[in-house]
């Protein structure tokens, strides 16, 4: 069974969070029934005390390497079973809308992997927001996860808000259907990150709002408004 084969891959990588969701909400629903979404933890789970941009970027690259390995394994299974699939690109389409073709974050929330935090990043109970997401659209039906429909960040937690260097975050709790512009000024964030292209040869990774999040910190019990 296809689903069992896919789950077997993740059983060999127990630190990776994964789930399935239907994509009836997506314009790609005419071509694919489902999305497999998974979250690979960064190489280091940095806090503000040990954060540097270089270490954060290295953590992203470490997670990206593992992610690519998993994707290749899943691709082999799908090809063997002659199942139609598509791997959406990570990158945004352009510098105007700053949106990807398929939102990994939306799919992750609907698959039950995590919720949108006040920093507009997916927050997982296990690692907080310090994960790299990927998704594969698959033309099959699976056992779907329980979706998140609202944020679980404590109302009085503002750590990501306060640490943001360009003050792009608006201290708003997420609910399903809320536009991201109500949570974050993405253009302001993007302008700040883009200012480093000449110096670094790329946008700065800037993960301060991820490092500040108390969810998933080693030795710290997560607290939510739902506890």
Language model segments and positions:
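Non-catalytic, usually N-terminal nucleic-acid engagement modules in DNA/RNA processing proteins
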Residues: 1-72
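Catalytic cores of enzyme domains
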Residues: 63-227
């Amino acid at each position: 069974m296809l689903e069992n084969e896919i789950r077997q891959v993740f059983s060999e990588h127990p630190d990776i969070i994964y789930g399935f969701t239907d994509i009836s909400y997506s314009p790609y629903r005419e071509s694919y029934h489902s999305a497999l979404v998974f979250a690979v933890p960064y190489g280091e789970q940095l806090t503000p005390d040990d954060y540097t941009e270089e270490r954060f970027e290295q953590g992203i690259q470490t997670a990206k390497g593992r992610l690519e390995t998993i994707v290749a394994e899943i691709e082999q299974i799908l090809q063997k079973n002659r199942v139609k699939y598509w791997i959406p690109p990570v990158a945004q389409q352009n510098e105007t809308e700053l949106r990807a073709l398929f939102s990994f974050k939306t799919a992750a929330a609907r698959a039950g992997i995590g919720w949108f935090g006040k920093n507009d990043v997916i927050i997982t109970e296990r690692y907080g927001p310090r994960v790299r997401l990927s998704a594969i659209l698959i033309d099959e039906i699976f056992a779907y996860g329980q979706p998140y429909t609202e944020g679980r960040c404590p109302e009085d937690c503002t750590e990501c808000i306060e640490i943001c260097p360009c003050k792009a975050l608006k201290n708003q709790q997420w609910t399903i259907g809320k536009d991201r512009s109500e949570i974050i000024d993405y253009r302001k964030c993007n302008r700040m990150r883009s200012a480093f292209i000449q110096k670094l040869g790329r946008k700065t990774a800037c993960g301060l709002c991820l490092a500040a999040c108390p969810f998933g910190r080693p030795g710290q019990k997560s607290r939510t408004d739902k506890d």
